[in-house]
């Protein structure tokens, strides 16, 4: 889990647009972020496996 101070800091609007860093909206993780879902890979996998994300299904071939 991310520090509360880092999550609050990332929610503020940066002085320059280039300073913006995406964070997972669920856990606050800054790395392995999927823009389409606004989640990190760990939360995406967790919520997709229990069917919380519409349109995402487990792949099989």
UniProtKB/Swiss-Prot annotation:
Binds 1 zinc ion per subunit. One of its GO terms (cellular component) is small ribosomal subunit. Keywords: Metal-binding, Ribonucleoprotein, Ribosomal protein, RNA-binding, rRNA-binding, Zinc. Binds 16S rRNA, required for the assembly of 30S particles and may also be responsible for determining the conformation of the 16S rRNA at the A site. Part of the 30S ribosomal subunit. Contacts proteins S3 and S10. InterPro entries: Ribosomal_uS14, Ribosomal_uS14_bact, Ribosomal_uS14_CS, Ribosomal_uS14_sf. Zn(2+) binds at residues 24, 27, 40, 43. This is Small ribosomal subunit protein uS14. Its cofactor is Zn(2+). One of its GO terms (biological process) is translation. Signal peptide: none annotated. Pfam families: Ribosomal_S14 (PF00253). It comes from Pelobacter propionicus (strain DSM 2379 / NBRC 103807 / OttBd1). It comes from the Bacteria.
């Amino acid at each position: 889990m991310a520090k509360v101070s880092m999550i609050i800091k990332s929610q503020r609007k940066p002085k320059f647009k280039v300073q913006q860093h995406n964070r997972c909206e669920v856990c606050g993780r800054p790395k392995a972020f999927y823009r389409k879902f606004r989640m990190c890979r760990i939360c995406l996998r967790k919520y997709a496996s229990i069917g919380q994300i519409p349109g995402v299904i487990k792949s099989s071939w």
